[in-house]
């Protein structure tokens, strides 16, 4: 693909993003209100649609960069915890634009769940603790807007501080079809571990929820950072599905 075509693709994505109305702070409607779109697959994309999307999204991934000693130490702590399989995240269970996923600590059995309501450029979140088949709302519901700095809150001495950040990615194909990914970055600062939970919005409706991605991570300069393969490298969390 030529550089000119890539530039045109990105310009189209920006123009598409500007066409979406902003979500008002006081809006409490849980019903998605995004426009409907024409969605006609070409013969090429019928056979290779998923591969094509993965390739295009891959070009929009954030790049890894060097991080400082403090962040590197947190990354290493997270890597060690993940190697022990001390934490896992359930796949999203969705009904319409309302989804739920649970974070499970395996070394010291504890579990809390997060409920998401995905809406235009924002995600409404509730935190729920599960114990002995009983649920207790810890926080929320509250709204995180995509593109904003993380919202952080303390959840007790064991879990510590939890940070949530909304990110989105928008893409147009050569036929003008919009593909939008909405993701929530979840960071457990005490453990140096995070998760990225994403859904895809295509043809005027939610179509795909992706398997949550666990990563070693930290917060730096007002954003959640995801550790790379190299010890001292990380990247700003993005909305590219894995």
UniProtKB/Swiss-Prot annotation:
Signal peptide: 1-19
PTM entry text: Contains 5 disulfide bonds.
Superkingdom, natural source: Eukaryota
Cell location: Secreted
Single annotated GO MF: toxin activity
Tissue distribution: Expressed by the venom gland (posterior main gland) (at protein level).
Record-level GO cellular component terms: extracellular region
Propeptide stretch(es), residue numbers: 20-46
Keywords on record: Disulfide bond, Secreted, Signal, Toxin
Record's function text: Highly abundant protein that may be responsible for the observed disruption of sensory neuron membranes, since it is homologous to proteins such as trialysin, which forms pores in lipid bilayers. Probable insecticidal toxin.
Family per similarity comment: Belongs to the redulysin-like family.
Protein name, as recorded: Venom redulysin 2
Origin species: Platymeris rhadamanthus (Red spot assassin bug)
Organism placement in taxonomy: Eukaryota, Metazoa, Ecdysozoa, Arthropoda, Hexapoda
